[in-house]
């Protein structure tokens, strides 16, 4: 049986198999530790019965309550290739959404590469919609051009009028994101 539990510092030494996917954004250890220190409830790992890490979600709470922009943000969601297509990503997203509801969020958002249609379709199946396109959000390597991202959102129960998911009519640049 899969165990969903809080991510711990020790997991930083055990999750490389998950991060090997070329579509997974990886960060330095201080970045992960910052999330672990500031938003531990938003950092969840899935562990197989034998102790192998299957996947994780890392997020945070951010935004302005006064402007109805307080929300949960998915910084990273990744599942090891051998554990995909089992509903694990959906379960991790559901947990982050529940935490965001309890924290009084208006919505949950995330950024995803426009080219990652598998992920885009999964998020749409989970109730997310494209709020805006962010031009050249992802930096490329090997001389490739930078890649655009979709900022996808799902309204939570506090956003009764679903204002947070009304799509913007034009793309934005990364520096225009608050």
UniProtKB/Swiss-Prot annotation:
Q: Which InterPro entries match?
A: Acyl_CoA_acyltransferase, GNAT_dom, NatB_acetyltransferase_subunit
Q: Where is the N-acetyltransferase domain?
A: 2-157
Write out the GO cellular component annotations. Answer: cytoplasm; cytosol; NatB complex; nucleus
**Effect after changing residue 54 to V:** In MRT73; decreased complex formation with NAA25 and decreased N-acetylation catalytic activity in vitro for all 4 types of substrates; does not affect protein stability
Q: Where in the cell is it found?
A: Cytoplasm; Nucleus
Catalytic reaction list:
N-terminal L-methionyl-L-asparaginyl-[protein] + acetyl-CoA = N-terminal N(alpha)-acetyl-L-methionyl-L-asparaginyl-[protein] + CoA + H(+); N-terminal L-methionyl-L-glutaminyl-[protein] + acetyl-CoA = N-terminal N(alpha)-acetyl-L-methionyl-L-glutaminyl-[protein] + CoA + H(+); N-terminal L-methionyl-L-aspartyl-[protein] + acetyl-CoA = N-terminal N(alpha)-acetyl-L-methionyl-L-aspartyl-[protein] + CoA + H(+); N-terminal L-methionyl-L-glutamyl-[protein] + acetyl-CoA = N-terminal N(alpha)-acetyl-L-methionyl-L-glutamyl-[protein] + CoA + H(+)
Q: Which Pfam families match?
A: Acetyltransf_1
Cysteine-cysteine disulfides: none
Please state the protein's primary subcellular location. cytoplasm
> According to the UniProt record, what class of enzyme is this?
transferase
Q: What is its EC number?
A: 2.3.1.254
Its GO biological process annotations read: N-terminal peptidyl-aspartic acid acetylation; N-terminal peptidyl-glutamic acid acetylation; N-terminal peptidyl-glutamine acetylation; N-terminal protein amino acid acetylation; regulation of actin cytoskeleton organization
Is Transferase there in the keyword field?
Answer: yes
Molecular function (GO) terms for this protein are:
protein N-terminal-methionine acetyltransferase activity; protein-N-terminal amino-acid acetyltransferase activity
Keywords associated with the record: Acyltransferase, Cytoplasm, Disease variant, Intellectual disability, Nucleus, Transferase
Similarity annotation: Belongs to the acetyltransferase family. ARD1 subfamily.
What biological function has been recorded for the protein in this entry? Catalytic subunit of the NatB complex which catalyzes acetylation of the N-terminal methionine residues of peptides beginning with Met-Asp, Met-Glu, Met-Asn and Met-Gln. Proteins with cell cycle functions are overrepresented in the pool of NatB substrates. Required for maintaining the structure and function of actomyosin fibers and for proper cellular migration.
Linked disorder reads: Intellectual developmental disorder, autosomal recessive 73: A form of intellectual disability, a disorder characterized by significantly below average general intellectual functioning associated with impairments in adaptive behavior and manifested during the developmental period. MRT73 patients manifest global developmental delay with hypotonia and mildly delayed walking, impaired intellectual development with poor or absent speech, and mildly dysmorphic features.
How does the record describe its quaternary structure? Component of the N-terminal acetyltransferase B (NatB) complex which is composed of NAA20 and NAA25.
Protein name (record): N-alpha-acetyltransferase 20
Starting at the broadest rank, the lineage of the source organism is:
Eukaryota, Metazoa, Chordata, Craniata, Vertebrata
């Amino acid at each position: 049986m899969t165990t969903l539990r809080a991510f711990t510092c020790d997991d930083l030494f055990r999750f490389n198999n998950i991060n090997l996917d070329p579509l997974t954004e990886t960060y330095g250890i201080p970045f992960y530790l910052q999330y672990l220190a500031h938003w531990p409830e938003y950092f969840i790992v899935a562990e197989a019965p034998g102790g192998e890490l299957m996947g994780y979600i890392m997020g945070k709470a951010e935004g302005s309550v006064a402007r109805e922009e307080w929300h949960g943000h998915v910084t990273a969601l990744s599942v090891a290739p051998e554990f995909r297509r089992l509903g694990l990503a959906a379960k991790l997203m559901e947990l982050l959404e529940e935490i965001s509801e309890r924290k009084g969020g208006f919505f949950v958002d995330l950024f995803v590469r426009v080219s990652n249609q598998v992920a885009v379709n999964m998020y749409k199946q989970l109730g997310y919609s494209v709020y805006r396109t962010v031009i050249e959000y992802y930096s490329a390597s090997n001389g490739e051009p930078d890649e655009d991202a979709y900022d996808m959102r799902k309204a939570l129960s506090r956003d009764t009028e679903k204002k947070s998911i009304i799509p913007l009519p034009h793309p934005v640049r990364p520096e225009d994101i608050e």
